[in-house]
Amino acid sequence: IGATGSHFSNGNTQYPNSGLNTVDCKVGLVYNFNRRADELAQSWQHPIVPPFPRHVSYDLTLFGSWRKKAVAHEGSSGQVPAPGTYNVFGFSFAPMYNFGYKFRAGVALDGVYDHSANMKESYEEENGFYTPPAKKQMALGLSARGEFVMPYFTVGIGLGANVLHGGGDMKSFYQILALKIDVTRNSYLHIGYNLREFHEPNYLMLGIGYRFNNKRPKLF
């Protein structure tokens, strides 16, 4: 018995980006033919799993992506899409306490530059939109992180807020859902998504990372 939830979208890289959410339930039944009850009580293999040394590791992640942007339309409560595609670059440095083989948690320093941040509709500009200077499009934030660790894959969530920013779009409470795919023992690919206020789509986080001071025992 189980349940599955899925969200499909284009990651705010194109318009429209309405998204699709699905939820389903699963029920399964298994019957084993000709299995003897005494075989279940026997252990045929005795894997040696060393004790886990609890420790603090440090994840450094660099990411980038592209996005579309909708800005407030003057004189109405609606929004209009800005022309073009805008770049996003960022980093994350996260000291993580490793509790065991399956879970780690910690805090992260998050930095981002979003070329679409704080754009405004402006009839004085040639394309009809005003883009502020770079200092209004950068931010530093702090987030709490938790990660479920599996062989080759790690699924993580983060909740944070920007503490140094240029105001406007960058003054936000953000959420992160990320997948890390091991490439080597300490390096990984990073695929994530950033939300604002739990419902506003923000940007993809496609990047690479490296884990320092990794004392996790090698099992495979």
Task: Say what each PLM segment does.
Residues 1, 35-38, 102-105, 150-156, ...:
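Repeated loop/turn-to-beta-strand initiation elements of outer-membrane beta-barrel proteins
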Residues 1-3, 25-31, 91-97, 109-111, ...:
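Residues on the lipid-exposed face of transmembrane beta-strands in outer-membrane beta-barrel proteins
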Residues 1-7, 56-68, 107-113, 144-148, ...:
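Transmembrane beta-barrel strands of outer-membrane/channel proteins
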Residues 2-4, 11-16, 117, 190-220:
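Outer-membrane beta-barrel translocator/channel fold
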Residues 12-15, 19-20, 83-85, 99-101, ...:
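Solvent-exposed loop/turn segments connecting transmembrane beta-strands
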Residues 19-25, 29, 54-56, 85-91, ...:
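Residues that define the transmembrane beta-barrel architecture of outer-membrane proteins
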Residues 21-42, 201-220:
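Outer-membrane beta-barrel "beta-signal"
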Residues 72-82, 116-134:
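Flexible, solvent-exposed loop segments that connect beta-strands
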